[in-house]
Amino acid sequence: MGVLENIVPGELYDANYDPDLLKIRKETKIKLHEYNTLSPADENKKSQVIRELLGSCTDNFIIEPPFYCDYGSNIYIGDNFYANHNLVILDGAKVVIGDNVFIAPNVGIYTAGHPIDVERRLQGLEYAMPVTIGDNVWIGGGVSIIPGVNIGKNSVIAAGSVVIRDIPENVVAAGNPCKVIRKITEKDSTTTNYRK
């Protein structure tokens, strides 16, 4: 997959018409179709198909179908990873996800972006920036993470957030655009009532 290695983070490349990239994406779609339509009872086959797709993973992870990505080979997931249904990862650049990360349904992790000016956008040009998610992060349902974002370890991203900037470690962040709401404190480890 040398053509993917030639993509320089933040620099424009031909994502829409490059025949090598189109071929890789088609092969990825075929594997994803197989993965997303396998019986839940066929755990061994599901594991084999997803492992062929990802850049790296451990033995201990779950990605609930349906799952979608552009290439798969730019996705690196840590140990004890769980992703609920409808995870979308546009992985023109690396997506590195740490250990013990939980992702709720309908989350989008996007490394791909397009030029603002219409001329270059219509030429099929785009750029890609890596996304990194630290250990022990929980990402709520419906979150969107844009190109180039880093989320620090132990943080929580509230449902529906749009993460456009880096989020530090050990915080709760929410909103559109996503902002730090508060630090995670010792009190959080003793809370038993989560009603509002």
From Swiss-Prot:
Disulfide bonds: none annotated. Pfam families: Hexapep, Mac. One of its GO terms (molecular function) is galactoside O-acetyltransferase activity. Acetyl-CoA binds at N84, G141, A159, I164, R165, K179, R182. Homodimer. The keyword Transferase applies. The active site is at H114 (proton donor/acceptor). SUPFAM superfamilies: Trimeric LpxA-like enzymes. This is Putative acetyltransferase YJL218W. One of its GO terms (cellular component) is mitochondrion. Keywords: Acyltransferase, Repeat, Transferase. The record marks N84 as: Transition state stabilizer. It comes from Saccharomyces cerevisiae (strain ATCC 204508 / S288c) (Baker's yeast). Belongs to the transferase hexapeptide repeat family. Its EC number is 2.3.1.-.
